[in-house]
Amino acid sequence: AGLFAQPRL
């Protein structure tokens, strides 16, 4: 979870 949980910023 966190920024790494999203495909891109």
Swiss-Prot record:
- Where does this polypeptide localize? Secreted
Provide this UniProt record's keywords sorted from A to Z: Amidation, Neuropeptide, Secreted
Q: Where is the signal peptide, in residue numbers?
A: none
Question: Which top-level group of life is the source organism from?
Answer: Eukaryota
Say if the entry is tagged with keyword Lipoprotein: no
Gene Ontology cellular component annotations, sorted alphabetically: extracellular region
Q: As annotated in Swiss-Prot or TrEMBL, what is the tissue specificity of this protein?
A: Expressed in the CNS and abdominal perisympathetic organs (aPSO). Not expressed in the ring gland, midgut or thoracic perisympathetic organs (tPSO) (at protein level).
Q: Which residues carry this modification: Leucine amide?
A: L9
**Would you kindly state one Gene Ontology biological process term found in this protein's UniProt entry?**
neuropeptide signaling pathway
- What family does the database annotate? Belongs to the periviscerokinin family.
The identity of this protein, by name, is CAPA-Periviscerokinin-2
Organism of origin: Delia radicum
